[in-house]
Amino acid sequence: MSQITIQTPRGVSISGTFTRPVDSHDAAVIFSHTFLSDRHASGMFDSLGRALRRAGYATLAFDFSGHGESGDEIITFDPLIEDFRAASGWLADQGFARQICVGHEFGATVALRANPPSVQTYVLVSPVLGPLSYDWDLVFSDVQLSDLERHGTTTVPDDTESVRRHFTINKGTLADMSMVSSEKVLRGVSVPVLITHDAFDEETGLLDRTRDAFPLLPDGSVLDMTAPPVGIAVEY
């Protein structure tokens, strides 16, 4: 296991963990976490990573900029798309030109929009593939909403075990979260995509957005309703 630092074209450093099993294949898995999370995805990526390495895959899990141990950034799609391309490029430079992306929620959206040439398939958990409606008054405090209105930015406490104390968002973050365009997300994606949703996604509308977008996905793509394997569910 190696702790690595990758420089993005705009000069922001992103921090990650790269692990190559002794009996690894020539393919690697790159993880893409959601907004306001980190490379561990509350333990989900750690559990999946161990299972994938037992199967012979090298893994790269990294913190997007503005998250975890990576450099500071206001959290919107554009810089995170650049981060993902930089991470995929780093993996390719290590000899892993065949990559599988495992993406979660908005991390899946970012990875699809990045669409680097080395990613040959996507496995997406609860991806956001269309617009969603939020009541921001229930999501943010009065102080945060006032900061957004007056200053254009606000902070959100990071309550994970990360070294980061808070995330920084702006009005663009809210627009990115609520105004996802399936056409924009899937434009240019030409490799098969496996999508998994659970019952909670059906309640929140994520499943409906995926069903709406599914005709835009490449041939061979699959949508599956699933629950996490018992071992992963316990650890997650």
Each predicted region: which residue ranges?
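Alpha/beta-hydrolase fold nucleophile elbow
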Residues: 94-105
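Short beta-strand element of the alpha/beta-hydrolase
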Residues: 26-34
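The serine-hydrolase catalytic nucleophile loop
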Residues: 36-49, 207-208
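Catalytic nucleophile-loop/oxyanion-hole region of alpha/beta-hydrolase
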Residues: 40-41, 65-96
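Glycine-rich nucleophile elbow surrounding the catalytic serine of serine-hydrolase chemistry
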Residues: 103-113
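The alpha/beta-hydrolase serine catalytic core
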Residues: 9, 14, 109, 118-236
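Conserved alpha/beta-hydrolase
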Residues: 49-69
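N-terminal cap/lid segment of alpha/beta-hydrolase-fold proteins
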Residues: 1-24
